[in-house]
């Protein structure tokens, strides 16, 4: 799937949404749906949904920004489309932005979460990070730790990292990076909250690997080159292309400040 922002309103009222609670401890519900297009399974998800207020979050917009960021940094990741659409939930029509992505499994592959794979295969006393090193996932995990620090990903639990296995070809691989909605300023719902948000504060995050501090986890990547590409001052326009009608100027400014300041700290620490 090509990374794209679709601003022309689409009719997606045929999608059937299921309620999935956030694992990050945040209030609200995240709804998901799926369809099949040209034989390929497509997954859809909404930003934070409130039964009374409707869609109140902007997690889907975060997905497209991180998608573009990882393209710049040369990290293998799932591509998203941000779509303006009419949808139906419990008989009520909402107009909102949602995101869509294709199934990353290849034919013959099955998937399991990294936490389940770890529980089934680790040796006693082995940490999740050491297990990933032994399993050959170390480069992937090191890059992930850097990504999660840059965007302050609050929800990299063990099911947000997946292992793909093909029993017929006896192959094993780790899935592209995905699911970055609970990042940046995702829990800010007003301009006052956005403008006062401390972009460098080391908040507690739901990490499967390492500690709950994304900053502390940088110790694992000291002296390592984790990105093939770079983030430069000229990349701002690319990151926020077609988003100026969706996010406020101050919101984009705070995200950009977070990325540039954390990118500076990241480079100083590794």
Name these PLM-found stretches.
Residues 43, 79-81, 158, 174-177, ...:
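A structural signal for short, well-ordered beta-strand segments and their strand-loop junctions
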Residues 57, 135, 249, 253:
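Charge-dense, low-complexity intrinsically disordered segments
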Residues 124-189:
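Conserved kinase catalytic-core segment
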Residues 91-95, 100-145, 245, 265-266:
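ATP-dependent phospho-/nucleotidyl transfer catalytic cores
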Residues 167-270:
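C-terminal catalytic region of ATP-dependent kinase domains
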Residues 2-112:
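Conserved ATP-binding subdomain of kinase catalytic cores across diverse folds
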Residues 68-72, 143, 147, 257, ...:
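A broad, structural surface signal
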Residues 10-20, 130-146, 188-192, 205-217:
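A short, terminal or domain-edge coil/loop segment
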